[in-house]
Amino acid sequence: MTAEIICVGTEILLGNIVNTNAAYLAEKLAGAGLDCYYQTVVGDNAERLAGVLKCAMERSDVILLSGGLGPTEDDLTKETVAKVCGKNLSVDDHSMERIAEFFAVRDIQPTDNNWKQAMVPEGAKVLDNDNGTAPGIILETDRNRIV
């Protein structure tokens, strides 16, 4: 089984931060017996991310995406995955509850952008995030598992 890592973020692409996520994920993939053949970094651009994702879907069984899940307007990973896979985004009620709780215990008022993190592609399995507000997802296609 082949795997590929796509890291999303202009700050990584420009070298403003070191891409430690790719190294961590590659090590975990190897430990799980998955062959990681490709690693790609793409900036916060939906069109370029879609192109990279389509290419990955042609050549890899498992695709891990890291980044682009935040509450800002340039965080477009889930939206792009949904579009490429022909899925609509829908609200995950459990994620909405977790986001509300995250902010309530900190006595912070969430913004409208925070709620977009509860949107997930239809049919995706939602992964709770105990360290922040953006849940992960697993989306299965006929050929791929996208995480």
Protein language model regions, located:
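Glycine-rich phosphate/diphosphate-binding loop of Rossmann-like nucleotide-binding domains
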Residues: 1-39
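Short glycine-rich anion-binding loops that position phosphate/pyrophosphate groups of nucleotides
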Residues: 11, 68-71
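Short beta->alpha junction loops
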Residues: 38-48
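An anion/phosphate-binding loop that grips the pyrophosphate of nucleotide cofactors and donors
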Residues: 60
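Proline/glycine-rich low-complexity loops and linkers
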Residues: 75-147
